[in-house]
């Protein structure tokens, strides 16, 4: 995941799944969050965190209840109404952020342009950066007012 030291108690990793598998290239892959939680209903009080990193799934291809394919296993997949799902995710991130807290949002434009995603949050982004081989991964920073 994003943090450098998985034992650093300043970091809390949430995911809605816990799994241990072998990827198609033979590598072991494990998702072992500190807290099992859905990003649309975070189990934290309002104004809890100074910094939140929001890296939701960006793939739309999964129509089954079980995730298949190495990308979907590794990154997850949006199901159902992705606009509603991401809108709720942004709302939850801002709810758990303290006033003047920072939200770092990561998005890959594999299926959906970042311009469509930014329509789903009421807070305007402050700064952003494109990265990746094709510059289709976006890192965007917001500040809660």
What positions do the PLM features span?
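Class I S-adenosyl-L-methionine-dependent methyltransferase catalytic core
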Residues: 1-145
């Amino acid at each position: 995941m994003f943090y450098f030291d998985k034992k650093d108690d300043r970091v809390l990793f949430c995911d809605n799944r816990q799994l241990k598998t072998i990827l198609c290239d033979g590598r072991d892959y494990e998702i072992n969050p500190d807290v099992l939680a859905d990003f649309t209903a975070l189990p934290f009080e309002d104004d809890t965190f100074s910094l939140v990193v929001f890296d939701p799934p960006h793939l739309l291809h999964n129509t089954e209840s079980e995730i298949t394919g190495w990308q979907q296993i590794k990154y997850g997949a949006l199901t159902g109404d992705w606009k509603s799902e991401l809108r709720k995710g942004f709302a939850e991130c801002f709810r758990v952020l303290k006033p003047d807290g920072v939200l770092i949002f990561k998005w890959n434009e594999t299926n959906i342009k970042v311009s469509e995603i930014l329509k789903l949050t009421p807070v305007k982004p402050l700064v952003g950066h494109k990265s990746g081989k094709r510059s289709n991964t976006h890192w965007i920073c917001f500040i809660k007012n």
